[in-house]
UniProtKB/Swiss-Prot annotation:
Consequence recorded when altering residue 135 to E: Strongly decreased interaction with FAS
GO molecular function term, any single one: caspase binding
GO biological process: apoptotic process; apoptotic signaling pathway; behavioral response to cocaine; cellular response to mechanical stimulus; death-inducing signaling complex assembly; defense response to virus; extrinsic apoptotic signaling pathway; extrinsic apoptotic signaling pathway in absence of ligand
Result when mutating residue 44 to R: Loss of interaction with CASP8. Abolishes induction of apoptosis. Decreased interaction with FAS
Effect annotated for changing residue 172 to K: Strongly decreased interaction with FAS
Stated role: Apoptotic adapter molecule that recruits caspases CASP8 or CASP10 to the activated FAS/CD95 or TNFRSF1A/TNFR-1 receptors. The resulting aggregate called the death-inducing signaling complex (DISC) performs CASP8 proteolytic activation. Active CASP8 initiates the subsequent cascade of caspases mediating apoptosis. Involved in interferon-mediated antiviral immune response, playing a role in the positive regulation of interferon signaling.
Main location: cytoplasm
Keyword Cell division: no
Name listed for the protein in its UniProt record: FAS-associated death domain protein
Pfam families: Death (PF00531), DED (PF01335)
Associated pathology: Infections, recurrent, associated with encephalopathy, hepatic dysfunction and cardiovascular malformations: A condition with biological features of autoimmune lymphoproliferative syndrome such as high-circulating CD4(-)CD8(-)TCR-alpha-beta(+) T-cell counts, and elevated IL10 and FASL levels. Affected individuals suffer from recurrent, stereotypical episodes of fever, encephalopathy, and mild liver dysfunction sometimes accompanied by generalized seizures.
Modification Phosphoserine, positions: 194
Subcellular location: Cytoplasm
């Protein structure tokens, strides 16, 4: 089964009936009332949102918004795990950004607006993020980073993030991002060298 559908099925099976009712209410502006009356599970609702392209594997913002409204941080973590897995199968730069995002989300607190502005996220979008995630600081940070990434596209790099953090005097967080990046680089180099080393050892054994 498609990994994104597996995620949605997992989320759906973890929702209570009252939470499903709340989700249906939150989606009134997106899904018609008659359609919502037919919804019997979270998966029914997610399927409708998929049909309307409101939900996609690469665009989980709405799913995050809905789960944040329910304060289901455990389910938000499943979305994080899904995105981390998707990044692992993507280009190395994408995987590096995902790792940097996790560090920043864990370590940037109430000063997230300053970082968002440094990344050229507009005040209008910052206000919108606050409205969507009134009680979830981590999701505010993550959403602002996502907006920056979608705007910058191929110009979105870890180096750019580190520079923005240092411009905001968030040097400790910048150091943490660089440490994680260096560890990843070392791991990647070790992984690339291992097969060569194995082949070298095998050749030596055969020669002896």
């Amino acid at each position: 089964m498609d990994p994104f559908l597996v995620l949605l099925h997992s989320v759906s099976s973890s929702l209570s009936s009252s939470e499903l009712t709340e989700l249906k209410f939150l989606c009134l502006g997106r899904v018609g009332k008659r359609k919502l009356e037919r919804v019997q599970s979270g998966l029914d609702l997610f399927s409708m949102l998929l049909e309307q392209n409101d939900l996609e594997p690469g665009h989980t913002e709405l799913l995050r918004e809905l789960l944040a409204s329910l304060r289901r941080h455990d389910l938000l973590r499943r979305v994080d795990d899904f995105e981390a897995g998707a990044a692992a199968g993507a280009a190395p730069g994408e995987e590096d950004l995902c790792a940097a995002f996790n560090v920043i989300c864990d370590n940037v607190g109430k000063d997230w607006r300053r970082l968002a502005r440094q990344l050229k996220v507009s005040d209008t979008k910052i206000d919108s993020i606050e409205d969507r995630y009134p009680r979830n600081l981590t999701e505010r940070v993550r959403e602002s980073l996502r907006i920056w990434k979608n705007t910058e596209k191929e110009n979105a790099t870890v180096a750019h993030l580190v520079g923005a953090l240092r411009s905001c005097q968030m040097n400790l967080v910048a150091d943490l991002v660089q440490e994680v990046q260096q560890a990843r680089d070392l791991q990647n180099r070790s992984g690339a060298m291992s097969p060569m080393s194995w082949n070298s050892d095998a050749s030596t054994s055969e020669a002896s």
